[in-house]
Structures are given as structure tokens and as C-alpha cells.
Design a protein with these regions (language model features):
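Sec-dependent N-terminal signal peptides
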Residues: 4-14
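Surface-exposed, charged secondary-structure patches
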Residues: 94-136, 187, 191-194
Length: 194
């Protein structure tokens, strides 16, 4: 009986690890899905909507939002936090999908991965050069705390962290408005309306 329990336990472990998606496979799959949308002969609006769906499924928008807000999040009440995350999600999805929708048939090749710790893996890739653009190095910071649901936490393009850049921008807005969170809310609202 003890051997049977051990065998069942080992089989469950093997099946669980087989079902969890490796970060590099996750990135390549995500890139392939986005590339398929961008390659279609559909309107820009349809491309943006398709990219938003992919982002909601693959990006840790809440985690990126918390990070982008920095220490200011400690001063917010629950209503302000909820308002921030609603605004941030709209802002993030519009910013992300609008930028990507300009690309036609981008080819990204995953090259390697580096295990950082049980929560993070860095996946290294390149946006393949074309006659119109040079090769671009893209590193993906993948949150792997739940191996069955890896999520993108950051993109580092040619050494520049998009999450860190976002955090610096939000900090600047807050600092230039005496820490008034409503100034950041207005900025996010204005961006999503335009």
C-alpha cells in the first residue's frame, strides 16, 4: 500500500510538471499569438482588441500596476486602490496594444532562459531585424510563482525596463503634484480618453 501511494504521488508530480508551461515556451506561444493577430488583414481596431485579450491573459497587470505606483500605494485607501487599478488596467491595455498594433508580422525568436528564483525566470529573445528596423534584444521577466499560470511582469528592451520606466513616470507625476494621487488619476484618465 505504501508503494502504491508513493507511485501515485510521483505520477501526480510528473503530470503536474508536464502540465505547467515553461517560461520560454509561454513567451514563444504568446508572441506567436500576437504575431498571428498582427499578420491578419483586419482593421487596426480589431488588432488592438485582439492584443488586449492576449495581454489580459498573459500579463500580470495588477503586479505591474502595484510596482508602477511604488511606495505611494501605501497611502491609498481601498477605494483609491480600486480606482487606480481600474484606471491603470485601461491605461496599460491601451498603451500596450496601441504600440504593438503598428507592427506588421513581427518575428520574435526566443533564445534562452535564466532561472532567477522560484518566482522569476528571465526569457531572452530578439525581435528579428528587417530592412526597416534593426534587431532588438527583448528580455521578458516572467512571474512563475504559479507554474501553471506564468505571467509577464516586465519587458526589458535593449536594457531598458518598461516597468521601471513606468514607475519613474508615475513618481514624477506624483512628485510634481505634491503626492496628490488625483493628479495621477487625471493623467491616466486623459490618456485613455484620447
Amino acid at each position: 500500500m505504501k508503494k502504491l501511494v508513493t507511485i501515485i504521488f510521483l505520477l501526480n508530480l510528473i503530470l503536474a510538471s508536464a502540465n505547467s508551461m515553461q517560461p520560454d515556451v509561454f513567451v514563444q506561444s504568446t508572441v506567436n499569438r500576437a504575431s498571428e493577430i498582427l499578420s491578419k488583414n483586419i482593421s487596426r481596431e480589431e488588432k488592438i482588441n485582439g492584443l488586449k485579450i492576449i495581454a489580459k491573459q498573459t500579463v500580470d497587470i495588477i503586479g505591474v500596476g502595484f510596482y508602477s505606483l511604488g511606495s505611494a500605494r501605501k497611502n491609498l485607501n481601498n477605494n483609491q486602490k480600486q480606482k487606480y487599478f481600474d484606471l491603470f488596467e485601461d491605461y496599460f491595455l491601451k498603451s500596450f496594444s496601441s504600440r504593438l498594433s503598428e507592427y506588421t508580422n513581427p518575428k520574435i525568436e526566443v533564445q534562452s532562459k535564466k532561472f532567477v528564483n522560484e518566482n522569476y525566470t528571465i526569457v531572452n529573445s530578439v525581435l528579428v531585424s528587417t530592412s526597416d528596423r534593426p534587431e532588438v534584444k527583448i528580455d521578458w521577466r516572467i512571474y512563475t510563482k504559479n507554474p501553471d499560470n506564468p505571467l509577464i511582469r516586465d519587458l526589458i528592451i535593449e536594457g531598458l525596463s518598461l516597468a521601471r520606466t513606468q514607475k519613474e513616470e508615475f513618481t514624477s507625476i506624483l512628485n510634481s503634484n505634491d503626492g496628490d494621487i488625483n493628479a495621477l488619476f487625471r493623467t491616466l484618465e486623459n490618456f485613455t480618453k484620447n
